[in-house]
């Protein structure tokens, strides 16, 4: 689906729905529910003006835009690729530290961060954990159980056995109608494996999630919006904050799309997600980099 062609999209699974809106998050809704902001694929350290001449400024602009939101979110989640790949362990840590310092500029101090393969695949997440902590974890917020999955630290694009056992144990604590939101970097389903847009053993994770009626997944990695349902499980990818990538399979190869001087920051942005807990619905609004 192309959300740019419609002001309103409703994706309905058997137990969850997502509305993609072009309206503001209301103060009335804020009193009843909650919302969070999702940033993704900031790639701090990337430096190629052909694809983004403002590579050191785009993340800062996004942080400023979030800080200008009239109603501040309950928390912010950053779904991976905080930094760009760097083979030098010392330089990699420098970039992780710089990115952390910029992220600390958010007014909202409850920030959930998870790795992307650019952050973690070269050393199984060791440097990442020095700066941001655990690569997978859970938390609860106002009636929603959030699960953060690490499908990037293993360089084979897989989820490890220990994490599967952990996931099974965590899900075993929940009722089948629990409100569950899952964050990860890669798509859990086979979006386009030829471009590494998948999780090699993602089907196993979905088999664990499938018995639960209300599951929604938010991820990054593909640098664009994509909305997909696996049965009743809805999957929603976020835009990048550094450069665009083509639609899945639209070009012979996965290549970065050049910066458009006539439309600076085109295709880049972040989103807010309003949780309507009783109905297990999530209202999404997309923001450009320059606006809050």
Predicted feature residues:
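N-terminal export signals
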Residues: 1, 7-27
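N-terminal active-site segment of His-dependent metallophosphoesterases
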Residues: 11, 24-93, 191
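Short, motif-level signal for alpha-helix interfacial/capping segments enriched in acidic residues
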Residues: 18, 22, 57-60, 197-212
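Active-site neighborhood of phospho(di)ester-bond hydrolases with catalytic His/Asp-centered motifs
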Residues: 39-40, 76-80, 111-117, 182-184, ...
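Solvent-exposed loop/turn segments at secondary-structure junctions
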Residues: 42-45, 82-85, 117-121, 152-155, ...
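Extended active-site neighborhood of metal-dependent phosphoesterases/phosphodiesterases
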Residues: 88-179, 199-216, 228-239, 243-283
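Short acidic, glycine-rich surface-loop motifs adjacent to enzyme active sites
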Residues: 175-191
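C-terminal/domain-terminus segments
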Residues: 284-292
């Amino acid at each position: 689906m192309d959300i740019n062609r419609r002001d309103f999209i409703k994706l309905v699974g058997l137990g969850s729905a997502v509305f993609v809106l072009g309206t503001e998050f209301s103060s009335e809704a804020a009193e009843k529910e909650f919302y969070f902001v999702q940033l993704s694929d900031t790639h701090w350290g990337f430096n190629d003006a052909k694809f983004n001449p403002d590579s050191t400024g785009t993340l800062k602009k996004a942080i400023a835009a979030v800080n200008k939101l009239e109603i501040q979110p309950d928390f912010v989640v950053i779904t991976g690729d905080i930094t760009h790949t760097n083979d030098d362990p010392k330089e990699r840590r420098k970039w992780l530290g710089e990115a952390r310092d910029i992220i600390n500029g958010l007014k909202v101090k409850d920030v959930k961060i998870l790795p992307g393969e650019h952050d973690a695949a070269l050393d199984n997440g060791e440097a990442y954990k020095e700066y941001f902590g655990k690569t997978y974890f859970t938390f609860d917020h106002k009636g929603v159980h959030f699960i953060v999955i690490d499908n990037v630290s293993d360089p084979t694009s897989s989820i490890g056995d220990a994490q599967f056992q952990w996931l099974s144990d965590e899900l075993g604590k929940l009722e089948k109608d629990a409100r569950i939101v899952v964050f990860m970097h890669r798509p859990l389903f086979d979006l386009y494996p030829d471009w590494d847009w998948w999780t090699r053993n993602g089907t196993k994770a979905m088999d664990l999630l499938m018995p639960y009626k209300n599951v929604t997944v938010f991820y990054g990695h593909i640098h664009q919006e994509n909305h997909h349902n696996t049965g009743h499980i809805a999957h929603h990818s976020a835009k990048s904050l550094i450069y665009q990538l083509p639609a899945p399979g639209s070009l012979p190869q996965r290549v970065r799309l050049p910066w458009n001087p006539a439309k600076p920051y085109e295709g880049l942005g972040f989103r807010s997600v309003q949780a309507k807990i009783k109905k297990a619905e999530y209202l999404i609004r997309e923001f450009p980099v320059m606006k809050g």
